[in-house]
């Protein structure tokens, strides 16, 4: 499913928790495995919003709901990366890398990994 909505941080954390749990999760599992100390009412609100936005489906399984991702983690990451690049750097990867370098955010190891990655892409 193609979903162009950008998620707020809390909803993204819920999605990351579900993605890390596998193919589906209950609200209790999300609450237990999330890195936040959320109340169940907050978790249920986030899950409901994610269903409304088309990121999750909800099916009744006995007495509980099972939430299944409709958007993969990789698809979301790729879309957000491209959007970030367009919004902040005018679509220029060079500008992004230059900004990171100027800010001192790139280590020698990062640069070596980038070179190796680019070498693999061109060969």
Predicted features and spans:
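Amphipathic alpha-helical dimerization/coiled-coil segments
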Residues: 80-123
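Pre-recognition alpha-helix immediately N-terminal to the DNA-recognition helix
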Residues: 12-17, 29, 95
């Amino acid at each position: 499913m193609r979903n162009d909505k950008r998620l707020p941080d809390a909803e993204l954390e819920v999605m990351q928790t579900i993605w890390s749990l596998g193919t589906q999760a209950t609200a209790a599992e999300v609450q237990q495995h999330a890195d936040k100390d959320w109340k169940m009412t907050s978790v249920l609100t986030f899950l409901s919003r994610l269903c409304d936005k088309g990121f999750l489906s909800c099916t009744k399984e006995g007495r509980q709901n099972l939430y299944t991702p409709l958007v993969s983690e990789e698809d979301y990451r790729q879309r957000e990366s491209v959007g970030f690049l367009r919004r902040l750097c005018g679509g220029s990867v060079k500008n992004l890398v230059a900004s990171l370098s100027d800010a001192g955010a790139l280590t020698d190891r990062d640069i070596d990994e980038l070179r190796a990655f680019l070498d693999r892409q061109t060969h």
